[in-house]
């Protein structure tokens, strides 16, 4: 009997050891393996011999009033999100990989329940003081107590503790690879500075920081100048070699984009990304373009893309019925807008995983059906029988077929025409809602959309407000419909929970106000499957079907190409990264600059 108990104890102890084997690595990937091997020299998309020097001047729209990117009020200055280095950093030619920056390496349990991060002993803040494990612990606590509520929700129960001067231990409340890696992107604050400042409050002066650039001058609301840190401790790390080549980065603020565009053409700043299709087609002309002083470049995007949508606030009674949301989607004539207003510059959004293999572009396969079938009674039938595609019009400005379909859906939902007005068949209440827009937004498309809705008897009021009012109304969910940018997602990540899970209903990221047990179930499975592509593929596609067929948001468009123009005073590596424009790899070319008109030679 004693022998059997002893053997059982040994077996249990051995199982415990096996269940939490300890691993160590210098680099990590959410899916698969990191692209770059241990002791790699530099990223493939940089020129490690790029010369340092010169200035690049960029533009920003609006104004700024502080230097704290994490403040809960105010407008932080351009580039303030890059003041601080992070424990690990990513590369721009692969999704979801992490390489050492402040950290040197990490050892972790193979079930991702904990990780111990070793800090590089050379890591320094700009005043020369060392970055320590205590600073990492302090930073996490700062975010938990004074940061945005979403951070506290995601990391509730997680602990971060300095267990040695240069070692920090993270214990996760919910073991998971992606949650562990998400904390690798944590910026590290100096405790000695931030212990006397609230993270939620604006800063009138730049904080003590640690990145490759520091703020050296500014005029509040008008311009910011960043200077390269000449003794930057991490300049020669593999992740930084060939990057951060400009001595100075200057941002000039403009209140109006048209004024900014004319300033660019006059040489007041150096580089402009163009989002207005008409501008790109008609205004990038003149002698400076003819003589190639200004380069106009358009490159196809092959990676996951940001997409634009109109979010229905489905907690408003007017949008609680899916048929109403579908009817309004049918009234959005993308083909006409794209041809008449945008010079066919946009592509139509059709997925929350645009340009990735996780987009549901075929009929559901067996693996997806296993996931979806148990929830069939709570799903639109189209999830199982059709491939989602936004309505397509003839592009003539009056698509009778789509409007007839919309009329049928509205009647089925209890909204009937009375004269020229769409009213509720029971209460007589008109079908009316407000479209909330940022004051600075391009709204060429709004009036045609409004006119199309009027043909259905629907009244859409238009209200433009400044950014602070937009933020306040989002936080209080005081809107009917508003535009949203859905950020590119290379794979279905645990970030989805902030945008769609019922637990995060008060998050401003959940613009439609969705609370769905079906979506909660899929997202919980996605979180559990992080790192497992075989499981994530059907889960991502299943979620995509559920979201699109429920019409929580109206698909607008996305940019299939990057449109960029710059004064020809820069050189860049032969290889462009897939997941960014790669401006951080460019350098000032004195020979090119010498050939330009004098007005555009700034930066020498």
UniProtKB/Swiss-Prot annotation:
One of its GO terms (molecular function) is ABC-type oligopeptide transporter activity. One of its GO terms (biological process) is oligopeptide transport. GO terms for cellular component: ATP-binding cassette (ABC) transporter complex, substrate-binding subunit-containing; membrane; outer membrane-bounded periplasmic space. Keywords: Signal. Residues 1-19 form the signal peptide. Disulfide bonds: none annotated. This is Uncharacterized protein YejA. It comes from Escherichia coli (strain K12). The gene is yejA.
């Amino acid at each position: 009997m004693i022998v059997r108990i002893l053997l059982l104890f040994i077996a249990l102890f051995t199982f415990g050891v096996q269940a939490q084997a300890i691993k160590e690595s210098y680099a990590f990937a959410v899916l698969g393996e990191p692209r770059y091997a241990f002791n790699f020299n530099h990223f493939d998309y940089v020129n490690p011999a790029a010369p340092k020097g010169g200035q690049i001047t960029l533009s920003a729209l609006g104004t700024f009033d502080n230097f704290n990117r994490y403040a809960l009020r105010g407008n932080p200055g351009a580039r303030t999100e890059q003041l601080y280095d992070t424990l690990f950093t990513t590369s721009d030619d692969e999704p979801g990989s992490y390489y050492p920056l402040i950290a040197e390496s990490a050892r972790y349990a193979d079930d991702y329940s904990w990780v111990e991060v070793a800090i590089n002993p050379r890591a320094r803040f700009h005043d020369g003081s060392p970055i320590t494990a205590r600073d990492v612990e302090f930073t996490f606590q700062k975010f938990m107590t004074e940061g945005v509520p979403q951070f506290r929700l995601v990391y509730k129960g997680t602990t971060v503790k300095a267990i040695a001067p240069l070692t920090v231990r993270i214990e996760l409340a919910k073991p998971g690879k992606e949650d562990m890696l998400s904390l690798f992107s944590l910026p590290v604050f100096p405790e000695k500075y931030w212990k006397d400042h609230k993270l939620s409050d604006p800063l009138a002066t730049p904080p003590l920081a640690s990145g490759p650039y520091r703020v050296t001058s500014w005029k509040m609301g008008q311009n910011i100048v960043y200077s390269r840190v000449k003794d930057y401790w991490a300049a020669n790390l593999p992740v930084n070699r060939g990057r951060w080549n400009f001595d100075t980065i200057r941002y000039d603020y403009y209140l109006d984009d048209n004024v900014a565009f004319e300033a660019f053409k006059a040489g007041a700043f150096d580089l402009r990304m163009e989002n207005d299709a008409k501008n790109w087609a008609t205004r990038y002309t003149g002698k400076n373009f003819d003589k190639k002083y200004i380069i106009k470049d358009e490159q196809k995007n092959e990676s996951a893309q940001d997409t634009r949508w109109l979010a229905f606030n489905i907690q408003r009674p007017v949008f609680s019925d899916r048929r109403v949301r579908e009817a309004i989607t049918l009234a959005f004539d993308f083909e006409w807008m794209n041809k008449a207003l945008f010079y066919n510059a946009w592509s139509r959004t059709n997925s929350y995983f645009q340009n990735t293999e996780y987009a549901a572009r075929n009929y559901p396969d067996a693996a997806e059906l296993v996931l979806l079938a148990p929830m069939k009674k709570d799903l639109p039938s189209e999830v199982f029988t059709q491939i989602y595609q936004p309505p397509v019009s003839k592009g003539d400005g009056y698509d009778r077929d789509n409007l007839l379909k919309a009329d049928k859906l509205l009647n089925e939902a209890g909204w009937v025409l009375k004269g020229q007005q769409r009213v509720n068949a029971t209460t007589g209440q008109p079908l009316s809602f407000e479209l909330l827009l940022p004051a600075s937004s391009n709204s060429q498309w709004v009036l045609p959309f409004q006119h199309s809705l009027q043909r259905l008897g629907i009244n859409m009021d238009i209200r433009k407000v400044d950014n602070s009012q937009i933020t306040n109304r989002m936080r209080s969910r005081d809107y009917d419909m508003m535009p949203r940018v859905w950020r590119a997602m290379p794979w279905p990540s645990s970030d989805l929970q902030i945008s769609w899970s019922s637990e995060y209903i008060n998050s401003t990221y959940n613009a439609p106000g969705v609370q769905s047990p079906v979506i909660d179930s899929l997202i919980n499975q996605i979180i559990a499957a992080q790192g497992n592509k075989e499981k994530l593929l059907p889960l991502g596609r299943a979620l995509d079907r559920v979201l699109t067929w429920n019409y929580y948001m109206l698909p607008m468009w996305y940019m299939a190409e990057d449109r960029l123009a710059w004064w020809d005073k820069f050189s860049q590596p032969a290889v462009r990264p897939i997941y960014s424009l790669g401006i951080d790899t460019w350098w000032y070319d004195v020979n090119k600059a010498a050939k330009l008109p004098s007005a555009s030679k700034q930066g020498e």
